[in-house]
Amino acid sequence: MKASMFLALAGLVLLFVVGYASESEEKEFPRELLSKIFAVDDFTGEERGCKGFGDSCTPGKNECCPNYACSSKHKWCKVYLGK
């Protein structure tokens, strides 16, 4: 009983997808869908002038961004709490 319900539901979903794809074929739906799925953001690799939370740092060099401080124990930038 459960298997037949699952197959019926899967068939309806497949029918819906095929119908939608055939209607959208004029708009190049498959190509557009694949390009959106496999799109890679353009990462320029710009470096910041400071290091953010969790970035490795050297204590005493003031490499971390404002509101962060280099932990002398762990050697990474942490949130500076003003102590």
From Swiss-Prot:
How would you summarize where this protein is expressed among tissues? Expressed by the venom gland.
Propeptide-annotated positions? 22-48
Q: Where in the cell is it found?
A: Secreted
Q: GO terms for CC?
A: extracellular region; host cell presynaptic membrane
**Any coiled-coil ranges, and where?**
none
Q: Which UniProt keywords apply?
A: Amidation, Disulfide bond, Ion channel impairing toxin, Knottin, Neurotoxin, Presynaptic neurotoxin, Secreted, Signal, Toxin, Voltage-gated sodium channel impairing toxin
Q: Which positions does the record annotate as the modified residue Leucine amide?
A: 81
The record ties this protein, via PROSITE patterns, to: HWTX_1
Main localisation: secreted
Organism's domain of life?
Eukaryota
Q: Which cysteines are joined by disulfide bonds?
A: 50-65, 57-70, 64-77
Question: What GO molecular function annotations does the UniProt record carry, in alphabetical order?
Answer: ion channel inhibitor activity; sodium channel regulator activity; toxin activity
- Which region is the signal sequence? 1-21
Q: What does this protein do?
A: Selective antagonist of neuronal tetrodotoxin (TTX)-sensitive voltage-gated sodium channels (IC(50)=1270 nM on Nav1.1/SCN1A, 270 nM on Nav1.2/SCN2A, 491 nM on Nav1.3/SCN3A and 232 nM on Nav1.7/SCN9A). This toxin suppress Nav1.7 current amplitude without significantly altering the activation, inactivation, and repriming kinetics. Short extreme depolarizations partially activate the toxin-bound channel, indicating voltage-dependent inhibition of this toxin. This toxin increases the deactivation of the Nav1.7 current after extreme depolarizations.
Question: Any miscellaneous information on file?
Answer: Negative results: has no activity on Nav1.4, Nav1.5, Nav1.8 and Nav1.9 sodium and calcium currents.
Family the entry assigns: Belongs to the neurotoxin 10 (Hwtx-1) family. 15 (Hntx-3) subfamily.
Quaternary data: Monomer.
**Per the record, what about its domains?**
The presence of a 'disulfide through disulfide knot' structurally defines this protein as a knottin.
**Name this polypeptide is given:** Hainantoxin-III 8
